[in-house]
Amino acid sequence: WVVTFVAYDCLYYWKHRFGHQWRIMWASHSAHHQSEEYNLSTALRQTSTDYIGFIFYLPLYLAGVPTEVIISVGSLNLIYQFWVHTEHVRRIGFLEWVLVTPSNHRVHHARNPEYIDKNYGGFFIIWDRIFGTFKDEETDRPCVYGVTNQLGSFNPLWANLYVWYDTFLISLKTKRWSDKVRVWFKGPGWYPEDAQPLKAADWQYPSFDPDISNFYKGYSFVQFWVITAVTLWLPSTQDIVSREFMLTVFFWCIFSLYVQGTFLE
């Protein structure tokens, strides 16, 4: 179990690192980084489109590690990561050298140029120290959170699909076939010569904070918890209700999330 936990965390480091360096993986992971706040709710911004991340854990399966052990250590790794998404804990002494902490993970979520593409570790920060991606939090350079291409939306569907859509448009626009493929495996800041962005990435921009009426805030709050309750209830009905009913409720939840995001803008 201990060996698997350490091995899993090392593989997670590489998955996470490629998640920032390949657009095909950044398209999935970007939803987690779009938040311009840094708190426990940021940890809950998980993608719905992580289709290839499992590839990085194949060595564990090939080594014969039981599936239940891999799932267990992966769950522990994920639970630990939840708690480091906070600004209330500053630094925790010598543990900063070994573990992922709120301080060094704040750096990972920052869009300041000096902090970008740093601190990919999940539980141990030693992988970043070994592979040259570690960056300490500097007291005179406070972290500014978010991505360099501001999403500018509270719509959860758009948050999950924006980078996929943008990358697809780039691959259509560029004329070289090699670039049509390359754009998916280059970093999110790379563009073909004939498909440059209309606006350059800029880390300095005001927070997205539209003026929303109290009615829309209240409605969205209630609607969110209704959707959450329905989502938790629906799987328990699979042996009772028809597939058509389940699909109808599922698409209602998706549409409701879209409406909720629209109201908040």
Residue ranges and their predicted role:
Residues 135, 186, 259-262:
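Hydrophobic alpha-helix feature that most strongly marks membrane-spanning transmembrane helices
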Residues 1, 14-19, 162-170, 194-196, ...:
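Hydrophobic alpha-helical transmembrane segments
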Residues 17-26, 179-201:
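Short, charged cytosolic
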Residues 39, 155, 176, 213, ...:
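Helix N-terminus capping/helix-initiation residues
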Residues 38-49, 201-220:
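Membrane interfacial helix-start motif at the N-side
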Residues 142-188:
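A membrane-cytosol interface segment of integral membrane proteins
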Residues 1-152, 156-160:
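Membrane-embedded catalytic scaffold of the fatty acid hydroxylase/desaturase
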Residues 209-265:
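Substrate-recognition/cap regions that form aromatic- and gly/pro-loop-enriched pockets
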